[in-house]
């Protein structure tokens, strides 16, 4: 597909069937911000960073110190599928009824999602990067455009996509959703990163692997080391994005939200989920 700028009356026709998306209004409104950016850091445990927060995420702290940081905000679920529905609607799970992947339950049409509300306000709404968990159950309703990559949703791609989108649609008031999973601990299904195997003792690198779902992972040196290293890497990439935003927008022209859908068991102080 392609985007075409249309400034005069045009007629589009073809001998073959074709699809035309909804038009994108190229205008700003003083009633809106030029950008509202919603960033989901999958599995990021704010409490899990503990006293190392300043060392792990200096760019995040620097940027959001100009706004509001909530230290006591907690998820309503232990994994993404039900948590995302709550995030997008503001409703507890007993209202959304969305609990388990594979169960064919769709969000009731009477519940309005955040992108549906933003679209009603005139924003061009784009799901710039996500795993697609809210597509079929309706939790991600309302986006004009969705770019979905199952599992492979690294922050480096999300940041670059976001910047390129903003440069392409700079004449719009944009609402963007970016989801990355670098901060999510994984188990034996994922190879050990080189930086971990190069620095940790051999016994930690070759520890018996738990092949259960990562939400059940118990605290261990390898998972903790990798998770903190990935958090540090995410902060570097987000610092690049934040520098771009502050260089191209005035303070009152944008809103950025950074949040997580759940914590992680690898930093837990107890053996309970």
Residue ranges with predicted function:
Residues 1-273:
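Catalytic domains that recognize anionic headgroups
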């Amino acid at each position: 597909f392609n985007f075409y700028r249309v400034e005069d009356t045009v007629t589009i026709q073809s001998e073959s069937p074709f699809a035309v998306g909804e038009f994108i209004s190229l205008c700003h409104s003083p009633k809106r911000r030029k950008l509202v950016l919603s960033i989901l850091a999958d599995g990021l445990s704010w409490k899990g960073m503990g006293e190392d927060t300043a060392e792990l995420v200096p760019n995040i702290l620097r940027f959001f110190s100009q706004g509001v940081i909530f230290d006591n905000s907690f998820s309503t679920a232990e994994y993404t599928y039900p948590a995302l529905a709550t995030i997008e609607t503001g409703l507890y799970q007993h209202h959304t009824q969305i609990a388990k992947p594979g169960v064919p339950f769709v969000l009731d049409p009477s519940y309005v999602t955040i992108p549906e509300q933003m679209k009603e306000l005139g924003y061009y709404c784009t799901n710039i990067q996500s795993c697609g968990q809210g597509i079929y159950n309706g939790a991600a309703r309302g986006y004009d455009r969705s770019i979905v990559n199952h599992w492979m949703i690294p922050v480096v791609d999300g940041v670059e996509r976001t910047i390129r989108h903003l440069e392409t649609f700079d004449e719009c008031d944009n609402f963007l959703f970016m989801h990355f999973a670098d901060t999510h601990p994984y188990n034996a299904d994922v190879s050990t990163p080189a930086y971990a195997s190069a620095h940790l003792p051999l016994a930690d690198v070759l520890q018996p692997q738990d092949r259960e779902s990562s939400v059940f992972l118990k605290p261990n040196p390898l998972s903790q080391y990798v998770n903190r290293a990935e958090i540090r890497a995410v902060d570097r990439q987000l610092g690049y994005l934040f520098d771009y935003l502050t260089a191209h927008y005035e303070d009152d022209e944008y809103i950025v939200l950074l949040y997580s859908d759940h914590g992680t068991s690898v930093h837990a102080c107890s053996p309970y989920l």
